[in-house]
């Protein structure tokens, strides 16, 4: 038998199945992301990029909150690393005035969300949250990646 096991089996981090379905959560996330875009577009460009960077750090912090609720040390350590990594990327992107790098950060966060959606992330999360976050992240990333922000 292989010594390599899936994260889900090793951590016992099943999704919790209360809440809206995947499609509803994706749509809700996209609507929230578009609402955020509307606010960001109303700001001067420098402030808009700062807000988009702070948003990426905040979105990463949500998973740390799930890790606190989860209570396992391993989840706390991994999610703290995730928060530090995405925050560092956001700071770098804002300092370099690089909306493209910030957009890449938001899309990279989609990967983190997908791991949790497929129950491969290290932390127990509500089943609907990764889908909501994916919809939001993509909606926020697109204007950054297309040069509209």
Residue ranges and their predicted role:
Residues 1-149:
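Short amphipathic, positively biased membrane-proximal segments
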């Amino acid at each position: 038998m292989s010594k390599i096991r899936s994260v889900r089996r090793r951590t016992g981090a099943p999704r919790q199945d209360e809440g809206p379905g995947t499609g509803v959560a994706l749509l809700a996330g996209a609507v929230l992301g578009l609402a955020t875009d509307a606010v960001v577009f109303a700001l001067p460009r420098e402030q808009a990029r700062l807000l988009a960077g702070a948003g990426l750090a905040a979105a990463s912090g949500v998973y740390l909150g799930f890790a606190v609720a989860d209570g396992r040390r391993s989840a706390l350590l991994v999610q703290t690393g995730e928060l530090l990594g995405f925050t560092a990327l956001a700071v770098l992107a804002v300092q370099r005035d690089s909306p493209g790098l910030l957009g890449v950060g938001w899309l990279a966060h989609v990967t983190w969300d997908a791991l949790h959606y497929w129950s491969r992330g290290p932390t127990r999360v509500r089943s609907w949250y990764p889908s909501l976050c994916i919809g939001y992240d993509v909606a926020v990333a697109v204007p950054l990646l297309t040069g509209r922000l």
